[in-house]
C-alpha cells in the first residue's frame, strides 16, 4: 500500500512540475503539440527512472561507503548526462522526426532540475531501491500527464481568437497557472488514503 501512496502522491498531489515547479523549461517549451509532448514525456520517463536507479546505486555503493557524499551532485549530473546522450542516440536512429521535434530540449534534459531533483530527493527520503523506482516512474508519469494536458490545451488555444493583450507568453502563463490550481485540488488525497488504510 505504501507504493500506491507514493504513486498517487507523485503523480497528482506533489506533481513535479505543477506543485514543485521543477522542470518548467521543457514544460513550457515542448508543450505546443501533443505528439511532441508525448515524445518528451517518454524521454523524461526513461531518463528519470533509469537515472534514479543508477544514482541510487552510486550513492549507496560508492559515495556512502567511501565517505564521498560531497560529490553527490557532480556524480548525479554525470550519470544523467550519459543517459541523455544514450537517449539522444537512440531517438536519432529510431525516430528522426521526434528527434527533430524535441530539438534543443532533448540535450536540456541533462540540466533538467526535475531529473536531478528526483535523484536527490529519493536519497533524502531514504527510499529503498524499489520505492525509488516507483517514485521516479510516478514522478515521470506526473510530468508527462501535466505536459500532455498542457499541450492539448495549447493546441485548442491555437484554434480560437485570443485578445491581443493575452497572446503569446501571457496566455501560456495564465493557462499554466490555472492547470496548477486544478492539480491543487488533489492536495490532501495522500493523507486521506493514509488514514483510510491505517498507514499514519
Residue ranges and their predicted role:
Residues 60-103:
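Ordered, amphipathic secondary-structure segments that act as subunit-interaction surfaces
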Residues 22-36, 84-98, 150-161:
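C-terminal ends of transmembrane helices
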Residues 2, 182-200:
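Juxtamembrane boundary at the C-terminal end of a transmembrane helix
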Residues 3-18, 67-82, 134-146:
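Structural signature of hydrophobic alpha-helical transmembrane segments
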Residues 6, 13, 44, 49, ...:
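Hydrophobic core segments of alpha-helical transmembrane domains in multi-pass membrane transport
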Residues 35-46, 70-76, 98-109, 163-170:
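Cytoplasmic-side transmembrane-helix entry/capping segments in multi-pass membrane proteins
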Residues 21-29, 88-94, 104-106, 113-126:
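Generic transmembrane alpha-helix signature in multi-pass membrane proteins
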Residues 1-5, 57-70, 120-131:
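Helix-coil boundary and interhelical linker segments in multi-pass alpha-helical membrane proteins
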